[in-house]
Amino acid sequence: MIGYTEVIQTMAAMIIFSMILISANSMIQRNTSMQIDGELEQEVISLGQEIIEEARSKSFDEQTQGDMPPSIIPGGFTPTSEFPTGEDQETRERSEFIAFEDYHNWSEIITTPHGDFNISVEVYYVDETSFEKVENQTTFKKIDVTVTSEFLHGGNEPKIYKLEFIRNYYAE
C-alpha cells in the first residue's frame, strides 16, 4: 500500500505543478501582449501627433499667407468646397502642403520598425462655441488624424485611434 500512496502523491504534485506552470505561462503571455500593445499605441500617438504638429506649422489658411490677410474674416478664408479632394491628394506629397487645409483628405501608409500604420486626415471648419463641424468659414478649423494598424485590435475589430486638434486663426 505504501507504494501506491507515493505514486498518488507524486501524481497530485505533478498536477498541481502543471496548473501553476499553465497559470504562469498565461500571465507571461498576457503581460507580453500588453507590453507590445503599449509600444504600438505609443507609435500611433507619435505618428498622429507628428502630423498635427506639422499641420500647425503651416498657415491657417491658403488665403492668409504672405503679408496681407484677407480683407473679410472669416469670409475670405478658403471655402470648404475648395479643400483638397481625395483625388487631389493622390498626386501630392506632404512636403508640398503650405496651409492647414492642405491636409484635408490626405492619407498614407507609413512603415516603421513596428509595422505599417494607415493614416488619414480630415480638416474642416468648426463652430466657435460648440466646436461642431460646419460648412461655412469660421476662425476655427479642426484636424482629425485617424491612425490604424493591422496589429492593434479591440476584440475582433481593428482599433481606430483618432487624434484631434482645433486651431484658431487669432491664436497664431
Show the residue positions of the predicted features.
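Low-complexity, Gly/Pro-rich coil/beta segments used as flexible assembly/activation regions
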Residues: 42-172
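Aliphatic-rich helix starts adjacent to a transmembrane/signal segment
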Residues: 2-49
